[in-house]
Amino acid sequence: MSGTSWLQFAALIAVLLLTAPALGGYLAKIYGDEAKKPGDRVFGPIERVIYQVCRVDPGSEQRWSTYALSVLAFSVMSFLLLYGIARFQGVLPFNPTDKPAVTDHVAFNAAVSFMTNTNWQSYSGEATMSHFTQMTGLAVQNFVSASAGMCVLAALIRGLARKRASTLGNFWVDLARTVLRIMFPLSFVVAILLVSQGVIQNLHGFIVANTLEGAPQLIPGGPVASQVAIKQLGTNGGGFFNVNSAHPFENYTPIGNFVENWAILIIPFALCFAFGKMVHDRRQGWAVLAIMGIIWIGMSVAAMSFEAKGNPRLDALGVTQQTTVDQSGGNLEGKEVRFGVGASGLWAASTTGTSNGSVNSMHDSYTPLGGMVPLAHMMLGEVSPGGTGVGLNGLLVMAILAVFIAGLMVGRTPEYLGKKIQATEMKLVTLYILAMPIALLSFAAASVLISSALASRNNPGPHGLSEILYAYTSGANNNGSAFAGLTASTWSYDTTIGVAMLIGRFFLIIPVLAIAGSLARKGTTPVTAATFPTHKPLFVGLVIGVVLIVGGLTFFPALALGPIVEQLSTQ
């Protein structure tokens, strides 16, 4: 792999470290308990109109159960709206190519997918969805589903920071502030940058062009830049086009690719700094940042290195896969030459470490070990750095589990940020940890046993199993990326992956809010010499170990039957 690839990696880390603290401080002010918020003069009047129309009292706060019901109610409304738009898109405006209504099972899957911030797509975007559906349905959900995840995180942090409190904030107020004060401004800036790098933004249908051979070719158009900006910033990932950010109209230049990769990561990393500021101990923010960063960097290096080695079967045929003056080297199957294996592998680690799921290369064409990296990264629970809000939720749950284990080892009641971790919290942590693996492995096992589901594979043997595993891993972790060799646009896959997405969203959000409510009611214990410090390298290593052991022990048998066996068969 060329030195340029490593330079891009180092530059991305540097830019993230420069920008994340500033954004994190801004986020902490938005979600903090202070009355004055940044942007009150601009956004305050708009928010007041929204509160009046929706009959929301911005001065009232909610208990965790009411907060959870608000999240559920909003999600149900979002699902019904998006499902209705997709089913009736044939009679709705901004449909220049007269696309018909989306079929029932595809509409169900798409509505669940975008409502849960998964953005799994069993359809081809430019061939299935009209501009109206893309703009008013999918793009709107990109904003609000990501914002809902950030609201849940804000509630959890308040639960850790407050003492003997019964409320966690107001979901509707948090949602309005997140969309208006965070997502809109960031998306506007990123969209302008993407347009400057050749990403299209128009309301055209298909344009007919004549190729050099004289045959006509249909060139799609659409409001792409505005949707790509929020799909990356909100770690949504659903592409306007079927090949997602591998399409030049979504991701044209290496600079644009860099901007999009930064956009995927910036909010999850910035939330670490917001966390440290909101709990009044910046060292805690640096600790969770270190945990996220170490895992993400490790996965990125692994993906880039495995793909740089190339396909071992081509080595046996004497094919040169080394970096030369006229090729970037490595396994270039399924990759864009303008990015090469370095930027592709880095993106793969970033998109699966978050809940993003967008791709600039085809993960199904990776080498067995290269493809195992994004698969395993999702199986860790997407905590490095995780999606907008939900990633840090998961990491804080793992931190609670880590301090519980540490407490058992020394015979002391475990504490996190001065709050005692007791049976109530651990039952909820257990539910959180078990929900995703149960959904993933149950549906994957059922699909292996059903002949019609097996028929959707384009590859037999261990790689076919990897395709099925990847689909349910992506759905249950609300990621959305895919091994595209699996034909998932069938009734069975649309339905079961849809259910997996619902479990992966709400069976995690509700326990997190319950944990937040339980912790908020507690007081804090004073720090003593026996208190386990949660801001030092020992704690960082312990949490990383818990994340790797929980993910590794749960999914290693499945990985052994899929990518590991496939790798051994290529030797």
From Swiss-Prot:
Chief place where the protein resides? membrane
InterPro entries per record = KdpA
A GO BP term here is: potassium ion transmembrane transport
The subcellular location is:
Cell membrane
Membrane topology, from the record: Multi-pass membrane protein
Q: What GO cellular component term, any one, is given?
A: plasma membrane
Q: Name one Pfam family in it.
A: KdpA
Q: Which residues cross the membrane?
A: 7-27, 66-86, 137-157, 188-208, 255-275, 286-306, 390-410, 430-450, 497-517, 538-558
Q: Which GO terms describe its molecular function?
A: P-type potassium transmembrane transporter activity; potassium ion binding
Keyword terms, alphabetized:
Cell membrane, Ion transport, Membrane, Potassium, Potassium transport, Transmembrane, Transmembrane helix, Transport
Its domain of life? Answer: Bacteria
Q: What task does this protein carry out? A: Part of the high-affinity ATP-driven potassium transport (or Kdp) system, which catalyzes the hydrolysis of ATP coupled with the electrogenic transport of potassium into the cytoplasm. This subunit binds the extracellular potassium ions and delivers the ions to the membrane domain of KdpB through an intramembrane tunnel.
UniProt family annotation:
Belongs to the KdpA family.
Quaternary state and partners of this protein? The system is composed of three essential subunits: KdpA, KdpB and KdpC.
**UniProt cross-references to HAMAP family, sorted A to Z:** KdpA
| NCBIfam families attached to this UniProt entry | kdpA
This protein is called Potassium-transporting ATPase potassium-binding subunit
Q: What is the lineage of its organism?
A: Bacteria, Bacillati, Actinomycetota, Actinomycetes, Mycobacteriales
